[in-house]
Amino acid sequence: MVAEAEVVFQQSLPAVLEIELFDGVSSAVKSPVSSPKLGFTQSTASVSGSLTTSPVQADIFPEGDCDPSVLDYIPTIRSGSFADIGPKRNMEDEHIRIDDLSSQVGSLFELPKPSAFYAVFDGHGGPEAAAYVRENAIRFFFEDEQFPQTSEVSSVYVEEVETSLRNAFLQADLALAEDCSISDSCGTTALTALICGRLLMVANAGDCRAVLCRKGRAIDMSEDHKPINLLERRRVEESGGFITNDGYLNEVLAVTRALGDWDLKLPHGSQSPLISEPEIKQITLTEDDEFLVIGCDGIWDVLTSQEAVSIVRRGLNRHNDPTRCARELVMEALGRNSFDNLTAVVVCFMTMDRGDKPVVPLEKRRCFSLSPEAFCSLRNLLDG
């Protein structure tokens, strides 16, 4: 496993994280130094603007009749990513890839191991909002918030992490409102994936998507916050907004949750059709979990979750390279005429005893039998 941290961006912007920065998918430049076995739960943010945390299911960290191999499982994390401007004139996607979070914030926090953090930001109305959140992500999500400190993951810890993530989304949203250099009509969707030990927690506001592959089956770890989502449509209409026939919020946005876009939001504390509160899902990783795919809507506009999982799974079986898998996913979406920027992140979970060899599905293996005559000929050939 290579412990690395990566922030990828397209524009030439000042770097603020102590990590390697990549301009698109080119070579890295150094940044200046600055700062169904287990439980599956979902937390939906309140629509009133207050912070709420739904209770964590008791079986998310079971200790009773659970298979001991599940309790002993520790994922080994590696990842890759790829981004392409697609047919658009400007690149408004940003993403973060940190395989070893402890190496980045270890001086500030005690974290369970392994720990990792990933994010995709899909900007609109310009690239500034997505770039701003990406640049300040460590501060928003870890430094400014009361992120819980412990080396052990428990139900209490999970609740505290969820609250911290929810606050981070709201604080990032407020920071965009206060930054005079960012237009009120500029915004970004945001999806983050945090791994702490066996815990995977995904927070989402917008139409990026995270999909977990469990034994080849796609499990959505986020919901698309689009006007066609009936629950989102109801919330928007109850908040005084409206959805047009062609699927736009207040005739402007194709999403119902986003950071920024303060020209569409009422004053802080008021109920607005467009909100920044994330929807949070969490799951306990097991040996059955192979990888996580995170992508912007440019991927999901033309690919289903299961199609994306199948593409990545085939790639890992061929070459076992998550970066190549991310590129293949983007190229497949482009081949299907995606009309947006495209970003894909592939996070692999691999137990220590699997090695680096790709796992070949049983159905791909072939057995051959020899006739007695052929067997005798082969033995004579081997015996010389």
UniProtKB/Swiss-Prot annotation:
Gene Ontology CC terms: cytosol; nucleus
| Catalyzed chemical reaction(s) | O-phospho-L-seryl-[protein] + H2O = L-seryl-[protein] + phosphate; O-phospho-L-threonyl-[protein] + H2O = L-threonyl-[protein] + phosphate
Its Enzyme Commission number?
Answer: 3.1.3.16
- Summarize where Mn(2+) 2 binds, as residue positions: D122, D297, D340
Q: What does the record say about how the cofactor binds? A: Binds 2 magnesium or manganese ions per subunit.
**Transmembrane spans:** none
Keywords (A to Z) from UniProt: Hydrolase, Magnesium, Manganese, Metal-binding, Protein phosphatase
Task: Name the SUPFAM superfamilies for this protein.
Answer: PP2C-like
Q: Name one GO biological process term.
A: response to salt stress
Say which family it is in: Belongs to the PP2C family.
Name by which UniProt lists this protein: Probable protein phosphatase 2C 49
Which source organism? Arabidopsis thaliana
